[in-house]
């Protein structure tokens, strides 16, 4: 008679297994890979708390689009803003985000995931007040730089926190909440920007971090971080809070401890050497690839310069109304993805996303080419908005949120902080390059050429997803790590495991 090990059972099955009790009788029980998957209320609270920070990030990302119009109006602004300075108002935030992303890695390792997230709240408030009270362009740039630094830290720490606290059954859904709330922030900025100038918009931005700070104070640190610090009892309490008072958290805690001990045995004393190990390099390169194709889709150029793009297109629809429509669609598409991601999986949504973006970017490029050739486009003035709507739906349902979700899933626990720091820094480097050079690209190859360029990048991104990106739907972090590092046992016999028979 061969007894099967519970740890060998595949993640997607819930097999019935007979165990022999102390009195010699067989006991039938269900092996569940996680504890109490029904109780998720506290996990929802934790997800909402950190996602409020993402709303601040979204507001900061969208600020340039409505603010620059009034900032460059000399009847509103007491100081002059040149075109070059205006480009830095948009470009300095991703550059500072790069610095924040690099600094965020050590922060989440030594301060903890929660404390790092919480530490961004007050600097966010200070940054927005600097902009609101600015009497020179330098104060605006200082505020944008400080907010960008916080955005970089938040971009790194939010997905790591959620990846380490939420159960696999709902990790996809709750893991997309930061993106959904980020899109709420974008929408708030677009709507408010229609009615207030750049200074009033900054005052609104200074209010948003307050509820984020209050809610974050209520949630625990991640159990996995406590385990890495040798605080097993604190990890147990955090798990109990997250899974419910009546949940048996011991199996999950033992799995976390075992995974950490295994990672420690394979780790070197040098973090850089750990990153460069072949087993760790694979998930890191996949994360970098996802970030590259996310930003080279041109999304930040679209968000930062939405009003200007519609003005250049000669759209018959009010420019500010266009940005609000795009914001509403962005928000709605993310919630659509939130509903589907744990049903369809990550890769299917990425396929749909990339295809939609390829088609719409090529369409936009063709529209601008037709217009720039001197043709009358007044009868298709609706086309830029229609293309933008489909483009945003495509981005927000896959390429936008999923790379951040997978950042907290595929990176091994031992290097999660440093690897996430590298990936986030790389993301913001790409963001800065695209944002700062978008105007130069348009000047060099025309706006039609710019959209065609981004469309080709999205097409390449589709093939990257097909051949290199793994499916993580429904898998625990420990199982994903074993698979990515090539330490998964062959489980064909376990997958077909039958109840053991006993002669009684």
Swiss-Prot record:
Its principal location? Answer: membrane
Does Ligase appear among the keywords?
no
Q: How does activity depend on pH?
A: Wide extracellular pH range, between 4.0 and 9.0.
Q: Which residues are glycosylated?
A: 73, 197
- Which compartments does it reside in? Cell membrane
Please give the InterPro entries that the UniProt record associates with this protein.
Answer: MFS_dom (IPR020846), MFS_ERD6/Tret1-like (IPR044775), MFS_sugar_transport-like (IPR005828), MFS_trans_sf (IPR036259), MFS_Trehalose_Transporter (IPR050549), Sugar/inositol_transpt (IPR003663), Sugar_transporter_CS (IPR005829)
- The answer to whether the entry has keyword Ribosomal protein is no
Q: In which tissues is it expressed?
A: Highest expression in the fat body. Not expressed in other tissues including the midgut, muscle, and integuments after 24 hours of dehydration.
Segments traversing the membrane: 40-60, 88-108, 121-141, 146-166, 172-192, 200-220, 284-304, 321-341, 348-368, 388-408, 425-445, 449-469
Induction, per UniProt = By hypersalinity.
Keywords, in A-Z order: Cell membrane, Glycoprotein, Membrane, Stress response, Sugar transport, Transmembrane, Transmembrane helix, Transport
Q: What GO MF terms are annotated?
A: sugar transmembrane transporter activity; trehalose transmembrane transporter activity
- Tell me the CDD domains matching this sequence: MFS_GLUT6_8_Class3_like
Tell me the residue ranges located in the Cytoplasmic compartment per UniProt. Answer: 1-39, 109-120, 167-171, 221-283, 342-347, 409-424, 470-504
Top-level taxonomic group = Eukaryota
Q: How does it sit in the membrane?
A: Multi-pass membrane protein
Q: Which family does it belong to?
A: Belongs to the major facilitator superfamily. Sugar transporter (TC 2.A.1.1) family. Trehalose transporter subfamily.
Question: What is the documented function of this protein?
Answer: High-capacity facilitative transporter for trehalose, required to induce anhydrobiosis. Anhydrobiotic larvae can survive almost complete dehydration. Does not transport maltose, sucrose or lactose. Mediates the bidirectional transfer of trehalose. Responsible for the transport of trehalose synthesized in the fat body and the incorporation of trehalose into other tissues that require a carbon source, thereby regulating trehalose levels in the hemolymph.
**NCBIfam families registered for this protein in UniProt:** SP (TIGR00879)
Q: What is this protein called?
A: Facilitated trehalose transporter Tret1
């Amino acid at each position: 008679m061969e007894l099967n090990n519970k740890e060998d059972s595949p993640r997607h099955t819930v097999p019935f297994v007979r165990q022999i009790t102390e009195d010699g009788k067989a006991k039938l029980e269900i092996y569940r890979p996680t504890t109490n998957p029904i109780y998720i209320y506290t996990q929802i609270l934790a997800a909402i708390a950190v996602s409020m920070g993402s709303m601040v990030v979204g507001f900061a990302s969208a600020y340039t689009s409505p603010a620059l119009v009034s900032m460059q109006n000399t009847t509103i602004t007491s100081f002059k803003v040149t075109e070059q300075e205006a480009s830095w108002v948009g470009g300095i935030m991703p550059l500072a985000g790069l610095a924040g992303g690099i600094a965020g890695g050590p922060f989440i390792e030594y301060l903890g995931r929660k404390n790092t997230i919480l530490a961004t709240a007050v600097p966010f408030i200070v940054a927005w007040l600097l902009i609101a009270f600015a009497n020179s362009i330098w104060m605006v740039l200082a505020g944008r730089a400080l907010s960008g630094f916080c955005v970089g830290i938040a971009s790194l720490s939010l997905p790591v926190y959620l990846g380490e606290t939420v159960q696999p059954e709902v990790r996809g859904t709750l893991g997309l909440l930061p993106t959904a709330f980020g899109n709420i922030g974008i929408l708030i900025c677009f709507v408010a920007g229609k009615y207030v100038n750049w200074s009033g918009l900054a005052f609104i931005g200074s209010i948003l971090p307050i509820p984020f700070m209050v809610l974050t104070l209520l949630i625990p640190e991640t159990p996995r971080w406590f385990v890495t610090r040798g605080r097993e009892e604190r990890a147990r309490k955090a798990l109990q809070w997250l899974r419910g008072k009546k949940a048996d958290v011991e199996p999950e805690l033992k799995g976390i401890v075992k995974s950490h001990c295994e990672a420690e045995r394979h780790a070197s004393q040098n973090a850089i050497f750990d990153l460069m190990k072949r087993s760790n390099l694979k998930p890191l390169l996949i994360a970098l690839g996802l970030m590259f194709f996310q930003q080279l889709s041109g999304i930040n150029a679209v968000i930062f310069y939405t009003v200007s793009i519609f003005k250049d297109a000669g759209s018959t629809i009010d420019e500010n109304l266009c940005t609000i429509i795009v914001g509403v669609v962005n928000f709605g598409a993310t919630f659509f993805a939130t509903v589907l991601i744990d049903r369809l999986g990550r890769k299917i949504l990425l396929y749909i996303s990339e295809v939609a973006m390829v088609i719409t970017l090529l369409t936009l490029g063709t529209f601008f080419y037709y217009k720039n050739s001197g043709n009358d486009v007044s009868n298709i003035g609706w086309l830029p908005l229609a293309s933008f709507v489909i483009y945003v739906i495509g981005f927000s349902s896959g390429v936008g949120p999923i790379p951040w979700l997978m950042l907290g899933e595929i990176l091994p626990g031992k290097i999660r902080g440093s690897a996430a720091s590298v990936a986030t820094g790389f993301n913001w480097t790409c963001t800065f390059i695209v944002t700062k050079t978008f105007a130069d690209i348009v000047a060099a190859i025309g706006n039609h050429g710019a959209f065609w360029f981004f469309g080709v990048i999205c097409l390449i991104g589709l093939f990257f997803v097909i051949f290199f990106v793994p499916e993580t739907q429904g898998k625990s972090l420990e199982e994903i790590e074993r698979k990515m590092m090539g330490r998964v046992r062959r489980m064909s016999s376990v997958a077909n495991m039958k109840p053991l028979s006993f002669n009684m």
